[in-house]
Design a protein with these regions (language model features):
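Glycine-rich, proline-tolerant flexible connector loops at the mouths of alpha/beta enzymes
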Residues: 33-62, 123
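Short secondary-structure transition/capping segments
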Residues: 41-45, 87-89, 125-127, 163-165, ...
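Histidine-acidic metal/acid-base catalytic patches
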Residues: 1-29, 34-36, 68, 109, ...
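Short, well-ordered beta-to-alpha junction loops that form the rim of enzyme active sites
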Residues: 79, 116-118, 153-155, 195, ...
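Conserved radical SAM core fold
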Residues: 34-41, 83, 120-122, 157-159, ...
Length: 304
């Protein structure tokens, strides 16, 4: 396994600075954020360490030289919008930018693009399904044609009132994954698995490692702390951030020893990338860098 981090937590740093920090800390790889340049739509979005618009082979070669000089690799390219938003104009922009990521990944010889399926949060899964097929069948075929695998993160994208009532990502649970992969059985369609979401959803985060072993292309290492006393007060219908807190790996409720024990048993040899969303470490660049250093020390015991 390779240990890396998601570059979104270092938005003010250049690609060269991110690579240098990763190398100095001892990371093996980085998932590079590729949002379109412009105002961020939400926290951790809007970060552009690789601008994939009109991306040339010359640009790709420069990036590859940069990461090679640092002695690391690119685990994947990341972009996490809502391709199934009911706003047709926005949805078209998101899908087109995903195609740009796929083409950039091909030029970079990076075989994974990580993203969300998306969702119209006001509609049921069944009501979203036709849009899912319309948007994602051609996207997965486009990725396959260019030798790229798509890793869908299992975050429900339901944290606050503006994402009520159902969140903005269909692909949050195994039942939906089964249905997705039956609908689009392409070997280029899989998961970017984050166990932390299953903690606050109160689901088994180990079983999917086995059940979907052949579909797990990439892993995010994030932790959460569930506030049971608060959950007892507000119940599961409250907005989820009212009863759980994102934390660094090792500071929440994920049993990382068990997680890596099962993950390694499946034969997984891909990237495990730290995703920092812990507000206790976000105030300054130095604190965010320290959060990555701390996470590296903790997780390296499991990845070797």
């Amino acid at each position: 396994m390779k240990l890396g981090f998601v570059s979104a937590i270092l938005p003010e740093q250049t690609l060269a600075e991110v690579v240098g920090f990763a190398a100095d800390t001892g990371f093996d790889c980085v998932e590079l954020m590729c949002w379109p340049k412009g105002k961020a739509e939400r926290r951790y979005a809007g970060v552009t360490h690789v601008d994939v618009t009109d991306f040339s082979q010359t640009e790709a070669d420069e990036i590859l030289q940069c990461v090679s000089d640092g002695g690391i690799t690119i685990s994947g390219l990341g972009y996490y919008p809502n391709p199934l938003t009911p706003n047709a104009t926005e949805a078209a922009i998101y899908s087109e930018h995903l195609k740009n990521l796929i083409l950039a990944a091909e030029r970079l010889s990076v075989d994974i693009v990580n993203t969300f399926i998306g969702r119209d949060q006001t509609r049921t899964i069944d009501e979203n399904w036709e849009r899912f097929k319309q948007v994602w069948k051609p996207l997965i075929q486009f990725a396959a044609d260019h030798g790229i695998r798509i890793g869908i993160e299992n975050c429900p994208m339901f944290f606050t009132e503006d994402e009520w009532p159902a969140g903005q990502n269909l692909a949050y649970c195994p039942e939906v994954w089964e249905r997705m992969f039956e609908e689009i059985p392409s070997p280029n369609f899989g998961l970017n698995f984050d166990p932390s979401h299953f903690i606050w959803l109160q689901m088994d985060y180990l079983k999917p490692l086995v059940t979907f072993a052949d579909r797990i292309f990439h892993v995010h290492a994030k932790d959460v702390r569930l506030d049971r006393a608060k959950l007892d007060e507000v119940g599961i219908l409250a907005t989820p951030l009212s009863y759980h807190t994102p934390k660094l790996p090792g500071l929440g409720d994920v049993n990382w020893g068990s997680f890596f024990s099962v993950l390694s048993d499946t034969g997984y040899e891909g990237a495990v990338c730290v995703e920092v969303e812990d507000r206790a470490y976000e105030e300054t660049l130095e604190m965010r860098q320290r959060s990555l250093q701390q996470s590296h020390i903790f997780l390296r015991q499991f990845t070797g």
